[in-house]
Amino acid sequence: MRRIVLLLLVVGFGNYLLAQTPSETNGKAVFDKWCAPCHGAVAPKNVMFGNGALAGTSALAVKYKGKLPAVLEQRTDLTPVMIKSVVRHGLYGMPITRKTEVSDAELDDVVAYLTRNLKK
């Protein structure tokens, strides 16, 4: 009986850990929904105004003057701490993102997606 209980606990805990592993795939989906409208590589076609520059990408292009990519998905220097801090607390013109908009688990997924190219 004890072995069965122990086995169930191990299997249950393993499933819990797997469910908590950040997902780059889900991170891309969350990024596309919440971040790409300002920080994407390509501006979506706007019926009223045509194709325009993205506010976040344009601001970063001016700030970095070609020294770093303006498109967040191309960056290799973004750390998990930096991403989480900017998302939750904002920076310059970027507003905060509440946990009711992007949960901590979703933010972890975005971090996994944006840090996939992190310099080792």
Where do the model's predicted regions map?
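Sec-dependent N-terminal signal peptides
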Residues: 4-13
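The canonical Cys-X-X-Cys-His
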Residues: 31-42, 94, 110, 114
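Electrostatic cytochrome c docking/interface patches
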Residues: 15-32, 41, 45-47
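Inter-heme linker and motif-flanking segments adjacent to c-type heme-binding CXXCH motifs
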Residues: 44, 117-120
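Gly/Gly-Pro-rich "capping" loops immediately C-terminal to redox-active cysteine motifs
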Residues: 28, 40-85
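Bacterial N-terminal signal peptides that target proteins for export
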Residues: 1-5, 95
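Axial heme c-ligation environment in periplasmic c-type cytochrome domains
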Residues: 64-78, 82-117
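Short amphipathic alpha-helical/adjacent loop interface patches that line ligand
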Residues: 35, 57, 91
